[in-house]
Amino acid sequence: MIIPIRCFTCGKPLGHLYAVFKRRVLAGEHPGRVLDDLGVTRYCCRRTLMAHVEWIDDVLLYERRS
């Protein structure tokens, strides 16, 4: 799993928040409220967490050719 460690725009550390954010959103909480509770107030940081897509499992299905 490759998660964003820092915000792409401002550089604020976000890696420690991603697991909590994902767990709470999958449990049915509103993403905006979760981000507010975690103290993520900047638009750039909110975008980084909300727009992240875990694609590593899909990429691993393809074989590498020499």
Swiss-Prot record:
PROSITE patterns, sorted: RNA_POL_N_8KD (PS01112)
Note describing how the cofactor binds: Binds 1 zinc ion.
EC annotation from Swiss-Prot or TrEMBL: 2.7.7.6
GO terms for MF: DNA binding; DNA-directed RNA polymerase activity; zinc ion binding
Classification via InterPro entries: RNA_pol_su_RPB10, RNA_pol_suN_Zn-BS, RPABC5/Rpb10
Catalytic activity, as annotated: RNA(n) + a ribonucleoside 5'-triphosphate = RNA(n+1) + diphosphate
Transmembrane segments: none
Description of how the protein assembles with itself and partners: Part of the RNA polymerase complex.
Protein role: DNA-dependent RNA polymerase (RNAP) catalyzes the transcription of DNA into RNA using the four ribonucleoside triphosphates as substrates.
HAMAP family to which the protein is assigned, alphabetical: RNApol_arch_Rpo10
Family to which this protein belongs: Belongs to the archaeal Rpo10/eukaryotic RPB10 RNA polymerase subunit family.
Listed name of the protein: DNA-directed RNA polymerase subunit Rpo10
